[in-house]
Amino acid sequence: MATSQPTRVLVVAHKTAATPSLLEAVRERAAKGPCTFTLLVPKRAHGLHTVVDAQDQSPDEAREVIELAVPLLEQAAGGRVESLIGDHEPLAAIQDAINLQGFDEIILSTLPARVSRWLKLDLPSKAGALGLPLTLVTAQAREEA
């Protein structure tokens, strides 16, 4: 399908939003052709979810992640990067973003398997089942934020 519109890429990350491996993936995607990027950071879990996951962030952490990561992502992308704070459940956040704004591709950035909640939840497979091309980026141990 030929189109003159740039490809809309949803970048989903939290603790890995400013890691070298994600920045490189954005740089590589930008080099493939016209595209726009939006960083989606799932917000803090609330209620019992915070008891279950003791490493959950403060209420403002998603905003802080965006403030840190967006300038670095813009540099890697060679242009403006939009940002969203999504639902605390990452798959719901991805579905909401796709349904409300429409995206053509997903770049999903996770921590290494030994510490990644998203990998334990099988988020890459679930997000891939949404029917969009998905690139999985896993941070290296030394990159962890």
Predicted regions and their residues:
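Structural motif
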Residues: 8, 105-107
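Glycine-rich, Arg-bearing micro-motifs that act as flexible, cationic patches
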Residues: 110-125
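Glycine- and acidic-residue-enriched helix-capping/strand-helix junction motifs
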Residues: 54-63
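Structural beta-alpha unit
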Residues: 1-2, 77-104
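Small/aliphatic-rich secondary-structure junction motif
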Residues: 3-53, 136-144
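Acidic/glycine-enriched edge-of-secondary-structure segments
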Residues: 6-13, 68-87
